[in-house]
Amino acid sequence: MKKTKIINLFAGPGAGKSTIASGLFHEMKKRHIKCDAPYEFPKELAWNESNKEIKDQLYVIANQHRGIVRSYGIVDYIILDSPLLLSLAYKDNYTSEYPANLYGDSFEMMMLDIHNKYDNINIFLERPDKSHENEGRFHDENTSLQLDRRIKSILEVNDISYTKIKVDEFTIKSILDLVLK
């Protein structure tokens, strides 16, 4: 089986992850690189205003992981605008009650274990000023900035290496240069 590389785009909501993932997918396909960009399951929940489902990060992550499993070993790269480890940042974000209170250390260890079994290229997107859109989201700009900090902290505390890339007109080229070096 082919060892697929996972391109993880990390940042809070509204930083441009989905737009960048789409552009990256387009540019890689133009270069005849075998890649996939699975649909961001949490975005589907946001558009459907599925507040109950988004609180259950085990459900969210299972559906998000299906997108990886579907094309893993078939393509060279999978581009994720909702990396698996984001579940660690979101598990307590919507509620500290049921079902979030079920997900303790064992959930975190499982997510880290799954993440570490993949060949990852981790990118933290540094959002531009005034980039946030509330449409199709559960979070406002302030919460999104807090999530940026929480995500970065999760990566650092768990010794997960990542490359910071500023979101601007050169972002996709910068990611391509990193991925294809």
Residue ranges and their predicted role:
Residues 17:
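Conserved lysine of the Walker
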Residues 40-42, 82-84, 124-128:
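Short loop/turn segments at strand-loop or loop-helix junctions that form parts
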